A protein has these predicted regions:
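Bacterial signal peptide processing site
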Residues: 31-34
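C-terminal motif of bacterial Sec signal peptides marking the signal peptidase cleavage site
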Residues: 26-29
Length: 226
């Protein structure tokens, strides 16, 4: 049984878990059919073409293979892009310093409905505070990055007076596995993989938002613990 952690809980160092078991999967089944059936989709593409084609670097695509064991994935929907998410985020920031939304979902070839990666964004209202949950390793990227064997988060401050006004937007980009199975593989390699994917999407988001200095994110991920 896989335990998933909310974005706010990760940021605040609180472990708020939802058990993906028979009840949760039953809810998915009611909404979208048999969760154990193969995901009905269209074309399958390389990892670098996911989430709009600008979000996943070659290095991050290799990391997706470490996480899922696959190198081909269901093509993302038209609105499941960094460009679309950045527009949502900037619109949300004009009325509130907090909010969240989806960027895209990643289904490996032959994946079932209940086994996916969710890539999300969140406006946190301020820089990171407190200690993260024990499962996470803190990395030096942006304001703070967190890596676990089943999730990665990069937190950065975005300054763009034309788009966002005088106050910086504090953005979390998260990559999390929702699955009935426990993570498989070397935990440290999985941590690096999640951090790499989260960094790649975060950098794409920072560029799309026009953040000053790309939100403090470098061209490649920093995987050494802080």
């Amino acid at each position: 049984m896989q335990m998933v952690i909310s974005r706010s809980a990760v940021r605040d160092g609180l472990v708020a878990v939802a058990v993906v078991g028979s009840i949760a999967l039953g809810a998915v089944g009611c909404a979208g059919g048999d969760d154990k059936a193969p995901k009905a989709g269209g074309e399958f593409v390389a990892g670098t073409l996911l989430c709009g084609g600008e979000a996943v670097s070659t290095e991050a695509a290799e990391s997706l293979k470490v996480i899922t064991g696959a190198s081909r994935f269901e093509e993302s929907d038209e609105d499941s892009t960094v460009e679309h998410a950045a527009k949502q985020l900037s619109q949300e920031f004009t009325s509130s310093v907090t909010g969240d939304g989806d960027i895209c979902q990643v289904f490996a070839i032959d994946a079932v409905q209940s086994d996916r990666l969710e890539v999300t964004w969140e406006l946190t209202g301020g820089p990171p505070e407190g200690e993260p949950a024990p499962k996470f390793t803190v990395l030096r990227m942006g304001e703070r990055a967190l890596a676990a064997p089943d999730a990665g988060v990069v937190q950065f401050a975005c300054r763009n007076e034309k788009l966002l006004g005088s106050q910086p937007a504090h953005v979390d980009v998260g990559v999390e596995r929702w699955s009935p199975k426990e993570p498989e593989g070397d935990p440290e390699k999985l941590k690096d993989a999640y951090a790499t994917v989260a960094h790649s999407v975060s950098l794409a988001m920072a560029k799309e938002l026009g953040c000053e200095n790309n939100g403090g994110l470098q061209a490649r991920p920093s995987l050494d613990p802080a």
